[in-house]
Amino acid sequence: MDSKKIVLFGDGCTGKSTMYHKIRDLKKEDYTFDKRYKATDEFDFMRVEIKTSIGDIMIDLWDTAGQENRGGKLRDAYLKGADGVILFYDVSEKKSAANIPEWLNQVKRVVPGVPVAVVGNKSDKLNELDQCESVKLRECNLQRDVGHSQIKNFLISIKNDTHIVSNSSFWSSKITYEVERGCLIGLEYLLSNLYNNTVKLA
């Protein structure tokens, strides 16, 4: 079975390692959010077979947490050969959101054209209006700032396992929540792009 290389990328303390362990534990019946956090000292790698709506898919998942400040060449090495990138930022930290274009430009330079899921984590720290504003600003600015055609923005909470969805009115403050592994929406987006089919995790 062919595997797809998926890289978790972006600022530190944004949820990359938590997502890594969540994907690793997909076969378990329960997943409990661990409030304890330990920054990753070096990259983690795993090959995992996951069940999806189009059959089993093998992914090579790379977690680069802890390497954010160790130089561009090292980060380039992690990105090389990637089939897709999940770029994390912290929606409760303006600086983290401001760093998105820099990370995206590195992705564009090293692996041009790969699909990128930009994932704003920790939405549980925001009120409803702030959540809507975050969705709006990111959707307006991402492609303009970077010029990358295969970017999709998602607002999630790994802690609450939710994906926040803005309704049909772009400027409305009304939002809904997708639960039951909603925080894995970014991975579903990448796999759907890579397999030219709508992919849902089983």
Model feature map: region roles:
Residues M1-A202:
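TRAFAC-class small GTPase G-domain
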